[in-house]
UniProtKB/Swiss-Prot annotation:
GO annotation (BP), single: protein refolding
Xref: Gene3D superfamilies: Hsp33 domain, HSP33 redox switch-like
Name by which UniProt lists this protein: 33 kDa chaperonin
UniProt key word NADP: no
Main location: cytoplasm
Origin superkingdom: Bacteria
CDD domains associated with the record: Hsp33
InterPro entries with a match to the protein in the record: Heat_shock_Hsp33, Heat_shock_Hsp33_C, Heat_shock_Hsp33_N
One function term, GO molecular function aspect: protein folding chaperone
UniProt gene name: hslO
General function of this protein: Redox regulated molecular chaperone. Protects both thermally unfolding and oxidatively damaged proteins from irreversible aggregation. Plays an important role in the bacterial defense system toward oxidative stress.
Annotated source species: Thermus thermophilus (strain ATCC 27634 / DSM 579 / HB8)
Localization per Swiss-Prot or TrEMBL: Cytoplasm
Membership in a protein family: Belongs to the HSP33 family.
Cellular component per GO, a single term: cytoplasm
């Protein structure tokens, strides 16, 4: 389990969110069988999403989704996080890999390639606010800082790091976001800039000094004051960070309705049932022939649970209007239920 800290620095001129996510990223690596550089890419994005959730989400039931689409061999990635420290994510090509950079570091930018970052903020009402910005470097941290400035008008410094060892297991992972508050004094910004230039890198600091030590180095001379989270029920004064998926057997079984009855019967004949793998977390669900044959014509959004297709009392099927769900996901219905041209 990881952890998230919040606080202020520079006598309130800087808002700070920091996360230690080593266990979270390692679980993602194991679940998806990620290559070392894919681990770094997804790990940075997951950590960044946790930081943005603390900075941007206004109510507990909101969620933030990062979608990175690039031309590199990774093929893109998707990450979702909430304000409670829950995060999940996946990459399109988990075993994709590229050579190390000349300095010996993982080349996340080349693995991601050129492209765009899309950020969705999903509200409890079903509304979704979406912003898209071009990728600056594909290294994730710079791209998130660029997004915060371009789309949210929030000048920020974002540091993200994932270090792997041995066969690719995660040695340390974490991140820090420093938001400049309106009216921040010039001397505070100058000190922050000087501290950033003097940093040896986030991952060496996390490995040698831990999260608190990294914050001390980054905010030296700026008087970091940690926010007391105990009033919110976090008795350790930190928010636990966990890899947590919202999939379950019911949702997995519903996914089979996207196959025709003939295709589902073929699964039963050839495989003795059906198997569904969650793309978010890699969880495998296996279903018996009886469970597969029990399917009714009902389709829900895999992300928010909204009914896309369901039987009415007269035996006809009711379909959702439009091509986009209220959460922003593209509506995909089984071929046999789509209106014929």
């Amino acid at each position: 389990m990881g952890r998230i800290l919040r606080g202020l620095a520079g006598e309130g001129d800087l808002r700070v969110v920091a996360a230690e996510t080593t266990d979270v990223v390692e679980e993602a690596r194991l679940r998806h069988g990620l290559s070392p550089t894919a681990t770094a890419a997804l790990g940075r994005a997951m950590t960044g999403a946790l930081l943005l959730a603390q900075l941007l989400l206004k109510t507990p039931k909101e969620r933030i989704t990062l979608r990175v689409e690039g031309t590199g061999p990774l093929g893109g990635l998707v990450v979702e996080a909430d304000a409670f420290g829950h995060v999940r994510g996946y990459v399109k090509n988990p075993r994709a890999e590229v050579p190390l950079r000349e300095d010996g570091k993982l080349n996340v930018g080349e693995l991601v390639g050129a492209g765009a970052l899309r950020v969705d903020r999903s509200l409890p009402s079903g509304e979704v606010y979406t912003s898209t910005v071009p990728l600056v470097s594909g290294e994730i941290a710079e791209d998130l800082a660029h997004y915060l400035w371009q789309s949210e008008q929030i000048p920020s410094a974002v540091l993200l790091g994932v270090r792997v060892k041995g066969e690719g297991e995660v040695e340390v992972a974490g991140g820090v976001a420093v938001q400049v508050m309106p009216g921040a004094r010039e001397e505070v910004l100058d000190r922050l800039e000087a501290n950033l230039k003097d940093l040896p890198g986030l991952t060496p600091l996390l490995r040698e000094r831990g999260l608190e030590g990294a914050l001390e180095a980054l905010l030296a001379g700026l008087g970091f004051e940690r926010t007391d989270l105990r009033a919110l029920g976090y008795f350790q004064n930190e928010i636990p960070a966990r890899f947590r998926c919202r999939c379950n057997r019911e949702k997995a079984l519903e996914a089979l309705v996207f196959f025709t009855p003939e295709e589902r019967e073929d699964m039963i004949v050839k495989d003795g049932g059906a198997e569904v793998v969650c793309h978010w977390c890699g969880e495998v669900y296996r279903f018996s022939p009886e469970e597969v044959r029990s399917l009714v014509a009902e389709v829900r959004c895999p992300d928010c649970g909204t009914l896309w297709l369901y039987p009415k009392g007269d035996g006809t099927l009711a379909r959702i209007e439009g091509e986009t769900c209220r959460c922003g996901r593209k509506v995909e219905l089984p071929s046999e239920t789509r209106p014929q041209a």
